[in-house]
């Protein structure tokens, strides 16, 4: 797999001046850094397949992880090349010949439901989706200290969240070692970035623990299960349906993991 990233140091923040209003009626101007929403179109074999709203860093990881969790690819070997333009606005993905894609019977474009906290993300067509059944993950032994350490990493602060309080974050670890951390507007994007990082660097997700800063509804659980991640931890709470899904597919789900 070849990855060609032409973008460098795109703006993540923008300074704005606003009027502050206090409870005592006092008003004054303040300046603050706020997060930038970045739009990126993803073309797979020259076909517009996704529109993503994100922050413009770790874009190749985001694309790779999203292709994986949307079942467009089953491994990094299915990708021949990922190209990200200099503005980070367009990603071009070339699949390997054995994943060239066959049209479904009607092959009509559609817009999928938008996941919560991933503002504006859309899957535009199902041309490459394989509809593979969800398979149980293989549980692994894990240590509670690993989870405490990841909760501490989050509590110690991530760069953009510390400045804006406007991002979710995700941490990828294996055998108690932190391998990668990232931030994004939405928790789904952050999880996809962590998954994409593992795929890009040949890390076996079946041996990994992932920690998310966000809630765990079913769509987050499905991403972890599809990726084969055995342990998913979160600072926040799960939904009842996500708990039921974790039991059914043998996903170890650890929530309210915070310092």
Where are these regions (language model features)?
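Alpha-helix initiation and capping sites
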Residues: 164, 185-188
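Intrinsically disordered, low-complexity regions enriched in acidic/Ser/Thr/Pro/Gln residues
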Residues: 2-175, 180-181
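Feature captures the catalytic cores and cofactor-binding loops of soluble hydro-lyases/lyases
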Residues: 187-259
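Histidine- and/or cysteine-centered catalytic micro-motif in compact active-site loops
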Residues: 175, 183-185, 215
């Amino acid at each position: 797999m070849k990855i060609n990233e032409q973008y460098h140091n795109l703006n993540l923040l923008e300074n704005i001046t606003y009027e502050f209003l206090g409870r005592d009626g006092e008003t004054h101007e303040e300046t603050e850094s706020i997060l930038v929403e970045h739009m990126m179109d993803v073309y797979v074999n020259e076909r517009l397949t996704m529109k993503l709203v994100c922050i413009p860093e770790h874009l190749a990881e985001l694309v790779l992880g999203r292709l994986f969790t949307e079942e467009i690819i089953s491994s990094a070997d299915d990708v021949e090349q990922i190209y990200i333009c200099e503005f980070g606005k367009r990603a071009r993905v070339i699949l390997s010949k054995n994943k060239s894609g066959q049209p479904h019977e009607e092959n009509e474009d559609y817009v999928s439901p938008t996941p919560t906290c991933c503002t504006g993300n859309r899957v535009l067509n199902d041309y490459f989706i394989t509809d593979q059944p969800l398979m149980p993950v293989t549980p692994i032994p894990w240590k509670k200290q690993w989870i405490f350490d990841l909760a501490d990493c989050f509590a110690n602060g991530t760069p953009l969240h510390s400045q804006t309080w406007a991002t979710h974050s995700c941490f990828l670890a294996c055998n108690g070692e932190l391998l990668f951390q990232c931030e994004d507007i939405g928790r789904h994007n952050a999880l996809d970035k962590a998954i994409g990082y593992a795929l890009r660097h040949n890390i076996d997700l079946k041996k990994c623990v992932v920690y998310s800063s966000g809630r765990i509804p079913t769509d987050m659980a499905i991403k972890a299960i599809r990726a084969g991640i055995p342990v998913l931890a979160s600072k926040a709470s799960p939904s009842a349906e996500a708990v039921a899904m974790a039991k059914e597919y043998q996903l170890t789900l650890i929530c309210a993991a915070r310092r």
